[in-house]
Amino acid sequence: MGTSSDIFELDPIYQGKGLRIGIVMSRFNKDICEGLLSACETELDRLGVAREDVLLVDVPGALEHPLALQKMAQSARYDALIAIGAVVRGDTYHFEIVSNESSRGILDVQLETGVPIANAILTVDTEEQAHVRMAEKGRDAARVAVEMANLLKRL
């Protein structure tokens, strides 16, 4: 990335070799989550993350992500974590609670532990929107995890 000044800038590194990645995936909206996971795994492979360096943990839903992610982050076994899930709007206020609180919890875990977490919990109005977004969001989560793990090693 070029800048117009003489300030040194760290370019992103997308090399996953040797990185240990933890993934927490919801069982709720399972077909969407499996689509996200498939795209994420494919991208992790492409970035050089070895399958034996990836651990997948299933949780019931999006509100359970922060606790599982916190425990994984505190273990010091992972360079980065990925949250995979899908919250589809229904007819009640529950959507807002789950969406907001899971996101807040994930951010809190990152800041508390210093372990980067790529948030690939889709929050959508319809299942169709989720299916349209899941492949790119899954790939993006893998890239974010690898980029942030490498960045934090350099800071």
Swiss-Prot record:
Its EC number is 2.5.1.78. One of its GO terms (molecular function) is 6,7-dimethyl-8-ribityllumazine synthase activity. InterPro entries: LS (IPR034964), LS/RS (IPR002180), LS/RS_sf (IPR036467). It comes from the Bacteria. Keywords: Riboflavin biosynthesis, Transferase. Pathway: Cofactor biosynthesis; riboflavin biosynthesis; riboflavin from 2-hydroxy-3-oxobutyl phosphate and 5-amino-6-(D-ribitylamino)uracil: step 1/2. (2S)-2-hydroxy-3-oxobutyl phosphate binds at D91, T92, R133. Coiled coil: none annotated. Belongs to the DMRL synthase family. Catalyzes the formation of 6,7-dimethyl-8-ribityllumazine by condensation of 5-amino-6-(D-ribitylamino)uracil with 3,4-dihydroxy-2-butanone 4-phosphate. This is the penultimate step in the biosynthesis of riboflavin. HAMAP family: Lumazine_synth. This is 6,7-dimethyl-8-ribityllumazine synthase.
